[in-house]
Regions:
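"A position-specific structural signal for the A-helix of alpha-solenoid helical repeats
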Residues: 85, 233, 266-270
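TPR/TPR-like alpha-solenoid helical repeat scaffolds
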Residues: 263-304
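A structural motif corresponding to the C-terminal lobe/cap of the Radical SAM core domain
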Residues: 6-222, 244-258, 275-288
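Catalytic-core helical/loop segments in enzymes performing group transfer/polymerization on anionic/lipid-linked
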Residues: 227-228, 234, 254-257
Length: 306
């Protein structure tokens, strides 16, 4: 199919953001997809822990996911994303750290982080309800996650307001402990920032920067206009590309922080400020990505494969 699209010179672009099977991402297939106009692919990994993958009967393996990522990194014109979930029944902090470490080793463009919210009546829902991870509710009361920012509106409405120092947020949680629902929300937020936004400080590939600008414009204008991180890092990328930032974008961020205690707390915790955009002066110490949930440098996951 891809070769025929190319042969006919249809001059179109397409994406597979609903998800592809990792094992199908071979050099031959992805090269043909890119040539035919593919601009985005999403891999539905969910977890980077072997035990969790087995428990949810996920057909993909860590080898599949890392192999697919290696292929996709060779095709920079494809914006490659990964779907991650936290909050599986019995999932410990150590298992979540496995997911974070595999995601980091994949080193792709975006991670769609979400908390597991199963449908009532399913085995996984019953298991989570029995463990107290979720409360049994009627269908009308069940909250669905709208993606990477699906929780933000819920948090900001006062249903979840975490104000802890996020740089030390998980230091006192035992690695063999199953996080509480409140802790899971903090973990979800923290993962989303460090796997997606913080790494933008280190991006210098022009193709990837353009992809991120397009992605953040959609987030800031359509999907989650209230999200302060989207506005801040859109401004940062504008600065890298042109040496300036539009006054309108600066005003949007100032308005967001002025009206939202939630975002003021988060920006303070992560060392971010609207003044960075106004002064065109960003943190100078952003040279290495922060380690998550561990003070020790984790060995590459691939070192333990096979």
């Amino acid at each position: 199919l891809f070769n025929e699209i190319t042969r006919r010179n249809l001059d179109l672009t397409w994406d597979a953001t609903n998800g592809v099977i990792a094992s199908s991402c071979t050099d031959e297939v992805i090269a043909a997809a890119a040539e035919s106009g593919c601009i985005a692919i999403n891999i539905g990994m969910e977890s980077g822990n072997r035990e969790i993958l087995k428990s949810v009967r996920k057909p993909g393996t860590l080898e599949n996911f890392l192999g697919a990522a290696e292929v996709l990194r060779r095709h920079e014109q494809i914006h490659a994303s990964v779907f991650l979930m936290v909050g599986f029944p019995g999932e410990t902090m150590s298992m979540i750290l496995d997911t974070i470490n595999v995601a980091r080793e994949m080193d792709l463009d975006w991670y769609r982080c979400a908390q597991l919210q199963p449908l009532p009546g399913t085995p996984i829902y019953d298991a989570m309800a029995a463990q107290g991870i979720i409360q049994e509710t009627g269908d009308k009361e069940l909250r669905f996650n709208g993606g990477a920012f699906g929780k933000q509106a819920e948090i900001e409405q006062g249903l979840r307001l975490a104000t802890a120092d996020f740089r030390e947020a998980f230091a006192n949680i035992p690695m063999d402990a199953v996080p509480t629902p409140d802790q899971l929300t903090d973990i979800w937020f923290f993962m989303n920032y460090h796997l997606n936004f913080h790494r933008i400080f280190h991006e210098r590939n022009q193709v990837k920067m353009d992809q991120l600008i397009a992605h953040l414009n959609v987030l800031a204008d359509v999907i989650s206009p209230e999200n302060g991180f989207s506005i801040y890092f859109l401004g940062y990328l504008e600065y890298l590309k042109s040496g300036s930032i539009s006054p309108e974008l600066v005003a949007r961020l100032e308005q967001r922080l002025d009206t939202s205690p939630f975002w003021r707390d988060r920006f303070e915790a992560f060392g971010l400020s609207a003044e960075h955009l106004k002064d065109l002066n960003f943190p100078e110490d952003e040279t290495q990505p922060l380690q998550l949930l561990s003070t020790n440098k984790a060995a590459p996951v691939s070192a333990g494969l096979g």
